[in-house]
């Protein structure tokens, strides 16, 4: 019995108990206490028994962690049938310093237990699991001990004010009246959650740590917009009405639900946002005048930890910077070659030539009222084509479908060009590729296949949906760990794979792929430039503009993202380079025995792993294939 089967067995057993409880209550009433005792004994056996294996221990830790996060329980989807018991769809997590301290204590104990499993008693997969869990837990411990207040929880890209709204509109299910009522209960918690966030900001303030001024500017504007919405046009209301209109409920019931939500938005949402807005306004003059984390207490050490966590390597900031410079030169040379093949005169920097191409009417959509629908239609067609084109290069394909949607209007001004959301564990929610269509001129047609390869097929959707669906992996390996070095490295590799196997339709499409790769190589330079070499935001923007040809808007959004999310952007290119390096090693050592499908299977079938683990897996596969 695999661990996933074991967990499903436990959940199935719990469901049987639930059904038994309902029948017992119906016929026996007071016998509920007896049934409750049965449930208690069942859960004690599952969660209190001695960990007889590292898989068992990490599964228990993960399940306890999941049930401690109502948002994650909703995201997974598998607990919705048990919502009468967990009531997770009625709740939001409320952060506190006490909870953070408790989590830290748990991590110390966790690390001690994991290290206590002797390698000689573990099988190959368990040794991999141990490496991952130790690496991840050590990073969490250091983050808490030294840098717990170094982040910017209210920022323009993934601020808590945006995340709360997006979670409710995109993840909370509304399939019946109870779930609609749960939605309202959750929205009512906004004020409590934001008040807890305000306490955190005030603790950070005591350390004289503030986000840069431009972050204050963006967040103040976003909060004012969220507060100013009329009830009927509030994103929380729009998606709510859209979903309940599809339910078989009477009009009076729908009207009452909508009225109740309107009252909650006025009494609990807007005041919560206002409290954060007041903090931003009152502390505006204290905003950090610098942009890099070098300016924070022990900032260099903090950045080193961020690089190690995100790249899963021991590269120093200077090494990452130099790799970036080398890659920018290499990619630029290939782009110049293509421009020459297309008949252009290469008489100016590649960035300027790409900027001219970005403004060429041949590659732009008309700015019509239905422009978003047209672009989404074309993206969906590209996804279908990609799904057919990749079939010769993989053994497995996701069961979950992928949909393309526009980035919500309330976040599109500052959101990235595209991003992906994984499907739910129970298969009821598809994978979603979000495309930012705020400025239609920022969607040149020659770059659309690149984004399709990256976010959908064979990029994020292939990897992350397959990971969730892979029942050969333990629960921890499916859900307990993730690193952008692997996920984003794979997505960037997927772009290049698209060129290599002929999924691009012309040289302009290849230029789109190269522009994307140039963009990721730039990240190595500008991220380390900002946080290690003390570059200003403006210097980083100038560098990226000259070398990529991206628009002013795109460059600004990206650079501002790296400032509030230090180190993460370096993981894409570092991950891609490692995957390509390992593929080349396998080709050289296996010769005619090399099969691209086998290589892809090794990279994808073991779940999301650090790059040092991926290298071990490829090396073992090479030796096994030789024999």
Briefly describe each language-model feature range.
Residues 10-11:
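Short hydrophobic targeting helices and cationic amphipathic motifs
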Residues 14-25, 439:
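Short, Lys/Arg-rich N-terminal segment immediately upstream of the first membrane anchor
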Residues 25-627:
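N-terminal maturation segment of proteins
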